[in-house]
């Protein structure tokens, strides 16, 4: 208001935003029979199992994070959540190019694109970028002053993590009749000849058109690349009452030992709330984490979406890129 000695000052209050987080519990057991120990020259397989526990847990936690990201990008409960999915997803018509990453991060976060620091991609995508000399290998200097290249690389200054567990889905893309490998779409009641495919068989379809007979598609693989920034996903080791324990059954299979492992973790994507709309037990499965109905953009909590205030989606350094290589 105008401070003129006669205008009343109007007070306003801040809204409180709410974020739901979820604890994910997982368990695993490994067993070794006494007989295996006896017939292998006293080889203790349980020692080998113990050495693999951390690696196994890392793999399970990675699956959990990928399921969470899938769920985040499947949000559809309100307009603002859908806007996040749209603005933070870039669909490349073909393989990655030199400008793909910069364009995608700018689309997602605008001036905040500088927050992005990690790129998770499939090896096929990484290979394509390497062939374009877009991946720069990190270097280190040893104690003798010799500079060597590391296996780790960076793209536009962002660390690249290569993992073939990233989604790579076979499906169909839009094409022209002249496109190499293109097939013609025919009606479902037609008998396809060479170079043709029934409309109902074009699945999954990655194009953006309303498919109909006499159109053309081309089979291919759609790769999903995730770009994350500092603080994109918060992590907390919640712990279990008994994380590790050994059990012995002297009768089963002539005697056997079992190593039990339990753990509970919390992965919370910044600016995204877990709502537990569809969850059968106290710990969500990866399928439930991947369900977009369980996620929503953080907001002020009003029952009606029209009355809510939402976090600015540009503050969330999470982006997704679809490409064909």
Where are these regions (language model features)?
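Flexible, glycine/threonine- and acidic-rich loop/arm segments that mediate assembly and lattice contacts
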Residues: 1-114, 123-154, 164-174, 178-181, ...
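Short acidic-hydrophobic, aromatic-tinged amphipathic segments that line or gate anion-handling sites
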Residues: 161
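Glycine-rich, aromatic-lined ligand/substrate-binding cores of catalytic
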Residues: 197
């Amino acid at each position: 208001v105008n401070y003129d000695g006669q205008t009343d000052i109007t007070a306003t209050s801040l809204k409180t935003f709410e974020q739901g987080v979820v604890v994910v519990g997982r368990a695993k057991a490994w067993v070794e029979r006494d007989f295996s120990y006896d017939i292998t020259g006293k080889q203790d397989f349980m020692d080998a199992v113990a050495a693999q526990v951390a690696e196994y847990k890392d793999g399970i936690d990675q699956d959990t994070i990928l399921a969470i990201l899938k769920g985040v990008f499947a949000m559809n409960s309100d307009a603002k959540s859908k806007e996040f999915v749209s603005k933070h997803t870039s669909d490349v018509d073909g393989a990655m190019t030199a400008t793909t990453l910069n364009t995608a991060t700018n689309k997602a976060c605008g001036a905040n694109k500088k927050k992005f620091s990690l790129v998770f991609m499939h090896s096929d995508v990484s290979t394509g970028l390497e062939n374009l000399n877009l991946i720069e290998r990190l270097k280190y200097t040893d104690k003798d002053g010799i500079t060597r290249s590391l296996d780790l690389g960076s793209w536009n200054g962002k660390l690249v993590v290569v993992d073939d567990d990233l989604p790579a889905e076979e499906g169909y893309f839009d094409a022209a009749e002249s496109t190499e490998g293109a097939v013609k779409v025919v009606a479902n009641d037609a008998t396809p000849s060479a170079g043709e495919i029934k409309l109902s068989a074009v699945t999954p379809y990655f194009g953006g058109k309303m498919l109909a007979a006499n159109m053309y598609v081309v089979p291919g693989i759609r790769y999903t690349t995730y770009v994350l920034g500092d603080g994109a996903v918060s992590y907390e080791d919640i712990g279990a009452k008994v994380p590790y324990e050994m059990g012995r059954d002297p009768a089963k299979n002539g005697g056997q030992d079992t190593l039990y492992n339990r753990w509970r973790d919390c992965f919370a994507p910044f600016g995204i709330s877990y709502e537990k709309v569809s969850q059968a037990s106290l710990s969500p499965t990866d399928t439930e984490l991947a369900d977009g109905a369980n996620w929503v953009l953080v907001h002020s909590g009003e029952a009606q979406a029209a009355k809510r205030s939402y976090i600015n989606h540009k503050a969330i350094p999470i982006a997704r890129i679809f490409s064909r290589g």
